[in-house]
Amino acid sequence: SLCDAQRKIEGVWKGKTRTYDLRGKKFCVCMAGNPYTESGEKFQIPDMLANRADTYNLGDVLSGREEAFGLSYIENALTSNAVLAPLAGRDPQDLMAMVRRARGESVATSELSSDYSAAETSAITAVLRHLFVVRDVLLRVNAEYVRSASQADAYRTEPPFKLQGSYRNMNKIAEKVVAAMNAQELETLIDDHYRGEAQTLTTGAEQNLLKLAELRERLSEAEAARWAQIKAEFRRQKSMGGAEDDPVTRLTGTLSGLGAELAAIRDAVLAAR
């Protein structure tokens, strides 16, 4: 009813339910609207809302706040990790001090508002360092996800990337991170997480995992060859008009592709003279 003529919304104030009438008033709605749903379908803000609002994408207003955005991944994951969970209920400055310590800075115990044993401090530092690695991967995934979602299908040279680098992903990985992990175990944890995420996509699990490996610079020689094959086939099908278009469109696309190939051969011959 918030989007229609009623302009009403149900809420809770001081433990009691009430209805808020927002007719004639300006208000702000914050919502998580990903370009794609978890199944890989395009997400659309309902017209009843989009036609009556100024819509701002986080990516459009993030400039200059990248560090704060990156830190928000750590802050939102605190309660998901057994070692870091106590920090969620303590002075926020304790987290900032622990983050600085995990980055290699010298932090005096007097800067902490709560008492931490040496073992607890060491475990928190180790887990935070692991989460920095996870966070950096998720930020790359998120950037590619947004870039791919904003690209028109007509200009794609490779399949769309639909794996997400969200707070939800961060929390799911963070709950399995322990201080004793080594670098390889951490990379394997990320691999396993995204292997499971890829299975929720309606199509394209393989191609998305290969793109992820490329982003992480972890493509094997065989995977690199397979990824190149998939991209070449994607471009070939697109040049032919796609898999679902009518025969005339496909024929036109094929002839257009032949023309482009002949032009490339002509240019190569002229360049060799």
Predicted regions and their residues:
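C-terminal regulatory/interaction module of P-loop NTP-utilizing enzymes
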Residues: S1-R273
